Regions:
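Short, structured loop/turn "capping" segments at alpha-beta junctions
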Residues: 117-123, 130-139, 172-174
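ATP-dependent adenylation/nucleotidyltransferase module used to activate substrates
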Residues: 1-127, 185, 203-213, 218, ...
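Short, conserved charged micro-motifs
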Residues: 193-203
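Short amphipathic alpha-helix segments
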Residues: 154-174, 202
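Short, low-order "capping/linker" segments at domain edges
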Residues: 226-238
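Internal, active-site/partner-interface "lid" segment
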Residues: 135-153
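Short, aliphatic-rich beta-strand segments
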Residues: 11, 180-191
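A short linear hydrophobic-aromatic micro-motif
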Residues: 172-177, 215-217
């Protein structure tokens, strides 16, 4: 919509980082190219942010503060008056320390401010004919590690490879997460897909061992957003 109103006076910005799968960047580049949207890619290194690799409960705050600081600097250097991001009303329902950084930096959240939920955004996207209307929700790869478990480049790569293998396995998984608990990979898929993954347990386990996991487990509760926040004490969510 910004592109329709402003043309090249609006620019889409994507970060390139070890915490985001390469396929996410490729999809962003392809989408902007197909829509004729001006697009910039900024290289970031979240593992160099002080405190990030230790994976504290406010890791997302540290990350958002750094990344959006870079984007704001880009905007100021190139004459853009505002920076927008895509949070929606549903994001209020989970622990989101990154939202504090967004507010502190003065970044605007127009979809959230308009009171739009994820389902409503998908419906509007369908009306506009956007290919992203059915795109599964996604969070950065750092969100696959329990708080307090150190995040490393090797660990991020291991998770990315495991998730990509599941997507390419022919299991027809539209949504999934591989949570890294030390040497154990905990696989989350929607409840309706659990039996299908379990039927190929030996193949999945063998693949995950190739990626460096000693064990592969299937979460019987199924996929849910922010599952690693479930054990976070209430006082840590503030």
């Amino acid at each position: 919509m910004a592109h329709e109103e402003l043309g090249d006076r609006a620019v889409a910005v994507t970060v390139r980082s070890s915490t985001f799968p390469r396929r996410e960047l490729d999809e962003a580049v392809a989408f902007c190219r197909s829509e004729g949207i001006r697009h910039e890619v900024i290289d970031t290194s979240e593992l160099d942010i002080p405190g990030f690799a230790e994976n504290p409960p406010d890791r997302c705050y540290l990350c958002k503060k750094s990344i959006f600081g870079r984007i704001i600097a880009f905007a100021q250097t190139n004459g853009f008056a505002a920076v927008l991001e895509g949070s929606n009303l549903d994001d209020d329902g989970d622990y989101r320390p990154g939202m504090r950084a967004i507010r502190e930096l003065g970044v605007r959240s127009p979809l959230h401010d308009a009171g739009l939920t994820k389902a409503e955004i998908r419906a509007l996207s369908r009306e506009m004919g956007l290919p992203t209307a059915e795109k599964p929700s996604f969070a950065c790869l750092a969100s696959r590690f329990p708080y307090g478990e150190r995040i490393t480049a090797a660990g991020l790569e291991r998770v990315e490879r495991a998730e990509q293998w599941l997507r390419d396995s022919g299991l027809g998984l539209a949504q999934l997460r591989v949570r890294s608990h030390g040497d154990l990979a905990r696989i989350e898929v929607p409840a309706g897909d659990i039996a299908r993954v379990a039927a190929r347990a030996d193949e999945v386990a063998a693949a995950f061992k190739r990626f460096g996991f000693a064990y592969a487990a299937l979460d019987l509760q199924g996929y849910r957003t922010g599952s690693l926040n479930e054990t976070l004490a209430a006082d840590k969510r503030k």
